[in-house]
Amino acid sequence: MMKRSFSIFTSVFLMMSILLLTACAGDQDSGGGDGKGEITFYSPETPDMTKELGQKFEELHDGSVNVQYAGTNVLVNRMMAEKDNPQGDVWYGGGGILPFEAAVDKGIVGKYIPDFAKDWDTVEDGIKVKHEDGKYVGVEVFVLGFAYNTDLVKADEAPKTWDDLLDPKWKGKIQFSNPAASGTATLMVLNQMMQRGEAEGWDYFKKLVDQANSMPDSGSAPTKAVSMGEAHIGVGFDFMAYEQKAKGESVDFVVPDKTPILVNPVSIVEGGPNPEGGKKLIDFLLSKEGQQILANWYHIPINPDVESKTPLTLEKVKSHAVDLDIDWVNENYDRVRNEWKEKFQ
């Protein structure tokens, strides 16, 4: 009788132990119930800056941040490949909203708008600051324009419009990144197509390619080339130039008369393993602490309580903004990139 009781007790104990271990393992694997655990953070933005954002979040909140850095198009392709078993939780950055808009119908971004941005209109001052269905929200403002080397170009001689780049005096002195690889350059191409029409747009880029001495794959490379004197003019975002200037390089920036001014967004990854942690990370990016890090890297913060460290603010640049036809972008994003490859590579 005693042996039988011992046997039953042992069986019940073992069963309870197995159930407990299984439950614990499930909690550790998901990390999604309370936001604790690892948060996988996909970003093409400056690796050191993105790492700093992750570290600051870890200081302030539970959970660890695993930063996964790659180019925008590489990350989008990765999320598409992982669609049936998502590995990321948050996707931040891609040279503005266009890659995010193109990704909405791909089923790789989920719906989440932080409380901080819930009262924003979808479009503020002519700039789309969040997705109408909550698929992304802007965390900073990017201005596409011209970096120039102040030792090689006088301020009053620097180009002020996109047509100025075709001036013969800049032949062999301009760099812009490769639209087949760079989200920054894709924005440049799509904008010109929308403003000029496709026939005139392709003619414009045929001339611009002849002006360039290089088309590197990285969106930041033309500005770095300007800082080293390898180019007089480089097409890029504002923060790229001001970051170089802050390092003591001979670089300044021109906001063209009419140019893309857009937010750089963040999205929750659809079906990611730690959605609650991902939401907390997005909240952090819009908080004063997160926005201050972006400002320290010379990005224009979207939170009005954080001061820009560059001469530019949303208020100062909004009059330069062009109207971007987002529906046209969604319909033509991949096609225009492929046509660029066929025409110029």
Regions found by a protein language model. Give the residues of each.
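Extracellular/periplasmic bilobal clamshell ligand-binding domains
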Residues: 311-345
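A ligand-binding cleft/hinge motif common to bilobed small-molecule-binding domains
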Residues: 97-102, 227, 231-250
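Early extracytoplasmic/lumenal segment of secretory-pathway proteins
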Residues: 25-26, 33-101
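Periplasmic-binding protein-like
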Residues: 142, 172-177, 204-209, 215-216, 247-270, 285-308, ...
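Extracytoplasmic ligand-binding site segments that recognize negatively charged/polar headgroups
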Residues: 43-51, 70, 87-230
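Short, low-complexity disordered leader/linker segments with a strong preference
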Residues: 1-39
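A bilobed periplasmic-binding-protein/Venus flytrap-type ligand-binding module shared by bacterial periplasmic
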Residues: 145-152, 190, 263-275, 285, ...
